[in-house]
């Protein structure tokens, strides 16, 4: 730790601005706030003397990761997951010094992960986590070099195949489910919620036939109206968590039995995709769907646009065959008098 509390109640700053092999600076203070201020002042002035070239930051990535974890990571909802992604990068790249994290190193990392069969989308998420870590360190004035990840081109991602349930399959699924698993399925089919978002709902999240999903993927709450029948079924006379007996592994097995050809990894999103697909088939607005699903970009929602009844219908009436199977007769009109 850069700052530790001593037995006499004081706080000691113990830092090496250029890394574990650099000059060691120690100072004791009566108040923790003074220790924190001194630490930031020392790091800033060591790295930011305008009349001198900035010294190379020789701190290892693992050391910077620990600083980030203590500062912010351990307080984030997905902190442990993000830490795991950063540690994978650290291991594959042999724990480089900060100045060694270059575009070349990142390209080598991406190539290694691809050779391991890791999808581009997963690799991009790894880089996003590392980028977020450096952003947090820079904002806290604990890192003064150039952001090593910013500007790095992400890998091109393949559009995932989306599977959805037909009306007949939905009927079979609901007939095969019971208890909280069935209630969650009905809620997801009614709102487009992710399984995890629904599973964490509490009774107080449903007011006047409106359900507010608090623990969302984007960390932004969203509210979706539901019918009175659905509200009564899932929340009537309940307190605390609405679905304490939900069993996702069991639900997944039932889903695979009903829809064996479901694309790999789509079981948890099949209900969400089914909602969005039928919403568009029934003439829903793509903008409204974006808001219901909580997508930050309309491009995410456009994958469902082709299910709309009127989608590109002009292709039928305006093509050369006019919707028929033979070319129409062409009459040439003479303009010679």
UniProtKB/Swiss-Prot annotation:
CDD domains according to UniProt: INT_Rci_Hp1_C
Domain Tyr recombinase, residue spans: 160-317
InterPro entries: CB, DNA_brk_join_enz, Integrase-like_cat_sf, Integrase_catalytic, Tyrosine_recombinase_XerCD
One biological process term in Gene Ontology: viral genome integration into host DNA
One family name in Pfam for this protein: Phage_integrase
Domain Core-binding (CB) span(s) in chain numbering: 59-138
Presence of keyword Ribonucleoprotein: no
Keyword Transferase tagged: yes
Keywords: DNA integration, DNA recombination, DNA-binding, Hydrolase, Transferase, Viral genome integration, Virus entry into host cell
Cystine pairings recorded for this chain: none
MF-aspect GO terms: DNA binding; hydrolase activity; transferase activity
EC number: 2.7.7.-, 3.1.-.-
Positions annotated as active site in the UniProt record: 194, 217, 269, 272, 295, 304
UniProt family annotation: Belongs to the 'phage' integrase family.
Function as written in the Swiss-Prot or TrEMBL entry: Integrase is necessary for integration of the phage into the host genome by site-specific recombination.
Name listed for the protein in its UniProt record: Integrase
Source species of the chain: Escherichia phage P2 (Bacteriophage P2)
Name of the coding gene: int
């Amino acid at each position: 730790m850069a700052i530790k509390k001593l037995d006499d109640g004081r706080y000691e700053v113990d830092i090496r601005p250029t890394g574990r092999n650099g000059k060691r600076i120690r100072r004791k203070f009566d108040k923790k706030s003074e220790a924190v201020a001194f630490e930031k002042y020392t790091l800033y002035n060591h790295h930011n003397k305008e009349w001198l070239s900035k010294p190379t930051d020789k701190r290892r990535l693992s050391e910077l990761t620990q600083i980030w974890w203590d500062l912010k990571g351990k307080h984030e909802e997905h902190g442990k997951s993000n830490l795991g992604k950063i540690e994978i990068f650290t291991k594959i790249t042999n724990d480089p010094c900060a100045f060694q994290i270059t575009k070349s190193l990142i390209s080598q990392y991406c190539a290694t992960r691809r050779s391991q069969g890791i999808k581009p989308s997963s690799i991009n998420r790894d880089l996003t986590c590392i980028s977020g870590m450096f952003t947090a360190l820079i904002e806290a004035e604990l890192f003064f070099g150039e952001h090593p990840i910013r500007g790095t081109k992400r890998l091109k991602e393949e559009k995932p195949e989306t599977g959805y349930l037909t009306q007949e399959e939905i009927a079979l699924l609901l007939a095969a489910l019971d208890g909280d698993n069935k209630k969650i399925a009905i809620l997801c089919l009614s709102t487009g919620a992710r399984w995890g978002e629904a599973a964490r709902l509490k009774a107080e999240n449903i007011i006047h036939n409106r359900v507010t999903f608090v623990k969302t993927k984007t960390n932004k709450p969203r509210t979706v109206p539901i019918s009175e029948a659905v509200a009564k079924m899932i929340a009537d006379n309940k307190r605390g968590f609405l679905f304490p007996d939900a069993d996702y592994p069991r639900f997944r097995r039932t889903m695979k039995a009903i829809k064996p050809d479901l694309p790999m990894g789509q079981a948890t999103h099949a209900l969400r995709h089914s909602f969005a697909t039928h919403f568009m088939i029934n003439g829903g607005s793509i903008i409204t769907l974006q808001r219901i699903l909580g997508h930050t970009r309309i491009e995410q929602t456009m994958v469902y646009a082709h299910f709309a009844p009127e989608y590109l219908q002009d292709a039928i009436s305006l093509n050369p065959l006019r919707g028929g199977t033979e070319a129409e007769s062409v009459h040439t009109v003479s303009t010679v008098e």
